[in-house]
């Protein structure tokens, strides 16, 4: 993935390299970097507005309405009272946090009839982009003469931090300096961070998650993947902590909502915050991703999710607690499966090797050997030498850091003992995790994860807990060891842990927690991870240097071609058209779906396709009102916009900058898109904004929200 400087310096996994050249109109473009070439192509596709209507330093623009929702999604401001539309799966954690067995908003949905009924969501934030400024010269000027890549990265991070500090951001702003274009350029970015965010409306999961894991990444799609929140501000309309006295935020700009629909080949544009892509990855990097990251992830998550699913199916309270965690895990699990299939189907490794041969020919014919001569060979060497460590780290991360939860809990517990000054923050984080945790379920997960670790990691790299405890005291029986941990440790149990914390002073607590079985396990796992990381880092720096030089070389090789920077969860736009596609020979997928498909798919015996009767009746009677087009209600649509994870909730705009949908997924046939964009196959799946309004109006009976919007 595209790595930030701090991730490179602190990361626990190998970094990836770069290759591949995207066409000028296929990319995730920085709005402040759009040029005449981009505009000409946008005009050709049907765009009608001036460029500064998208992003401007000195006047309101569409970018002012697009937000980072939570920690990894996008949202769009749609009213002058801070109303935000995003995806249901983006709001899923917030919906779950407010759900109980008696008030199950995941199952039944949530409708606030007044602003007073809107529910505050502790910990949820919304970020508005304030400005983005290129600072490449200021950073690069401090890097001259540094030849060691590790030192170069450290110095770059130091300079970036200094530039961010000089911005004098207040406590309600986030100021960062990010590397772009494979660490060849740098931009300073400032966000306003709003922390009073309230839940306004959520459809039932039978709508917002219709199709479940079966339909995830698939087309045709009939998912009403949306939820509604509101941003509140202080009396001065600036960000403020939650207060009952706060008022709805008055945004600089909000999006108008189109009721006009779309047809095939109409202009479509997304703006959002894509998380990471690897479009310049080399063939060796692609092999590494498949063998040493995706394959381990598929294996581990499949086993973990099977254990979770069985427990969730048997008990409603467990389902609520684990719903969000399961969805997040399964999403990336299925993505990895689809990515591997797509990479093979499209022969991406073969394409990358052809690109590498072209790069090598350019170097030879243009006398560039002194600068770029060893770039490809150094990348090949680094990937091959680092493959073993990367695979081991992925297995360790997926099993004991990301599989069983008790190891992470123990890390928090140990941090309380070793960082008493940060006591309140650590304890709050731990308590937040306790709310959605079942020790009895994790007791089943732990031995399954330990068994995978033993099978997949060499004996000399295993955490020493295997040799010293599991083998010595339990004769290798991981189930008996897991029972021991959960019987003797206080860490998995909120009540026991808090009782211990309250009954001891800091010194006694530190001594006691050090001997806790879960903490001993955690320390052993961390030590093993550090040893593997040490093996990985030398190759990681070599890969990072190769990436930087390879991209710089590509820019020289193609001087007249705009090469978009890989995604790094900063604001990007993508322009394209409404289009269906051919998934396989002899088949064609239409560019939109309708309510007819909901009735065809619905199945009361399936937890993924069951829909409440009162919703089905709306489809049966075709009670669509003004939201219909030719007597049908459009549910979802396709466009060839370029998106990835992080774009969830991104607004889809028409040629006039009006909202026509919310992006929520990509298609199964193009899961390789983070590495190789395939214009004939890759599609963005979006929920039609008219279906969103239909659910708010006809099902939710919430006209106050419709009245807030600017409908055109």
Curated annotation (Swiss-Prot):
This is Dipeptidyl-peptidase 7. Pfam families: Peptidase_S46. It is found in: Cell outer membrane. Optimum temperature is 43 degrees Celsius, using Ala-Phe-pNA as substrate. Catalyzes the removal of dipeptides from the N-terminus of oligopeptides. Shows a broad specificity for both aliphatic and aromatic residues in the P1 position, with glycine or proline being not acceptable in this position. Most potently cleaves the synthetic substrate Met-Leu-methylcoumaryl-7-amide (Met-Leu-MCA), Leu-Arg-MCA and Lys-Ala-MCA to a lesser extent. Is likely involved in amino acid metabolism and bacterial growth of asaccharolytic P.gingivalis, that utilizes amino acids from extracellular proteinaceous nutrients as energy and carbon sources. Its main location: membrane. GO terms for cellular component: cell outer membrane. The record marks 666 as: Critical for substrate specificity of DPP7. The active site is at 89 (charge relay system), 225 (charge relay system), 648 (charge relay system). GO terms for biological process: peptide catabolic process; proteolysis. It comes from Porphyromonas gingivalis (strain ATCC 33277 / DSM 20709 / CIP 103683 / JCM 12257 / NCTC 11834 / 2561).
């Amino acid at each position: 993935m595209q790595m930030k400087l701090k991730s490179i310096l602190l990361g626990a996994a190998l970094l990836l390299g770069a290759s591949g050249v995207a066409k000028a109109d296929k990319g995730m473009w920085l709005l402040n970097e759009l040029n005449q070439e981009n505009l000409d192509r946008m005009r050709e596709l049907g765009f009608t507005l001036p460029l500064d209507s998208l992003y401007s330093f000195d006047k309101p623009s569409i970018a002012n309405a697009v937000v980072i929702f939570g920690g990894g999604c996008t949202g769009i401001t749609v009213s002058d009272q801070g109303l935000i539309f995003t995806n249901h799966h983006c709001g899923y954690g917030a919906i779950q946090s407010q759900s109980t067995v008696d008030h199950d908003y995941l199952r039944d949905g949530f409708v606030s009839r007044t602003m007073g009924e809107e529910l505050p969501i502790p910990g949820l934030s919304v970020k508005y982009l304030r400005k983005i400024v290129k600072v490449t010269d200021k950073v690069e000027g401090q890097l001259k003469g540094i030849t060691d890549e590790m030192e170069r990265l450290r110095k770059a991070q130091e300079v970036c931090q200094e530039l961010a500090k000089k911005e004098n951001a207040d406590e309600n702003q986030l100021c960062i300096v990010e590397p772009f274009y494979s660490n060849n350029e740098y931009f300073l970015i400032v966000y306003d961070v709003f922390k009073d965010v309230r839940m306004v409306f959520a459809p039932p999961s039978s709508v917002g998650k219709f199709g479940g894991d079966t339909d995830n990444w698939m087309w045709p799609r009939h998912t009403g993947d949306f939820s509604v929140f509101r941003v509140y501000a202080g009396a001065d309309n600036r960000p403020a902590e939650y207060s009952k006295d706060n008022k709805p935020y008055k945004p600089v700009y909000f999006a108008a909502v189109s009721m006009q629909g779309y047809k095939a080949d109409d202009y479509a544009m997304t703006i959002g915050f894509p998380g990471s892509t690897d479009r310049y990855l080399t063939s060796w990097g692609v092999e590494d991703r498949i063998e040493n990251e995706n394959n381990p992830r598929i294996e581990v998550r499949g086993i973990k999710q099977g254990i979770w699913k069985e427990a969730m199916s048997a008990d409603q309270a467990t389902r609520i607690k684990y719903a969000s965690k399961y969805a997040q895990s399964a999403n990336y699990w299925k993505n990895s499966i689809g990515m591997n299939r797509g990479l093979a189907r499209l022969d991406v490794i073969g394409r990358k090797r052809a690109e590498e041969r072209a790069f090598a020919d350019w170097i030879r014919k243009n006398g560039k050997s002194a600068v770029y001569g060893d770039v490809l060979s150094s990348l090949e060497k680094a990937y091959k030498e680092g493959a073993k460590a990367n695979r081991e780290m992925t297995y360790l991360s997926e099993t004991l850091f990301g599989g069983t939860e008790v190891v992470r809990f123990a890390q928090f517990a140990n941090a309380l003992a070793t960082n008493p000054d940060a006591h309140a923050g650590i304890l709050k984080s731990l308590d937040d995790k306790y709310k959605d945790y079942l020790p009895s379920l994790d007791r089943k997960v732990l031995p399954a994860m330990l068994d995978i670790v033993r099978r997949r990691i060499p004996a000399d790299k295993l955490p020493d807990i295997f040799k010293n405890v599991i083998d010595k005291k339990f004769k290798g029986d991981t189930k008996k060891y897991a029972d021991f941990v959960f019987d003797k440790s206080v860490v998995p149990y909120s009540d026991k842990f808090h009782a211990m914390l309250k009954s001891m002073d800091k010194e006694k607590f530190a001594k006691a927690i050090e001997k806790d079985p879960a903490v001993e396990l955690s320390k052993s796992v961390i030590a093993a991870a550090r040893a593997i990381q040490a093996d990985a880092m030398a190759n990681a720096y070599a890969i990072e240097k190769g990436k930087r030089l390879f991209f710089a070389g590509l820019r020289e090789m193609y001087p007249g071609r705009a090469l978009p920077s890989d995604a790094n969860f900063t604001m990007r736009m993508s322009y394209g058209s409404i289009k269906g596609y051919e998934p396989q020979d002899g088949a064609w997928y239409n560019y939109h779906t309708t309510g007819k498909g909901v009735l065809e798919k619905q199945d009361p015996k399936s937890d993924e396709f069951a829909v409440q009767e009162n919703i089905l009746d709306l489809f049966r009677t075709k009670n669509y009102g003004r939201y219909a087009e030719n007597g049908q209600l459009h549910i979802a649509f396709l466009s060839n916009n370029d998106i990835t994870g992080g774009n969830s909730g991104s607004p889809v705009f028409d040629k006039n900058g009006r909202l026509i949908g919310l992006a929520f997924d990509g298609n199964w046939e193009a899961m390789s898109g983070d590495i190789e964009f395939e214009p004939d196959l890759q599609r963005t799946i979006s929920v039609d904004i008219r279906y969103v309004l239909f659910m708010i109006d006809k099902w939710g009976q919430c006209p106050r929200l419709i009245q807030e919007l600017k409908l055109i």
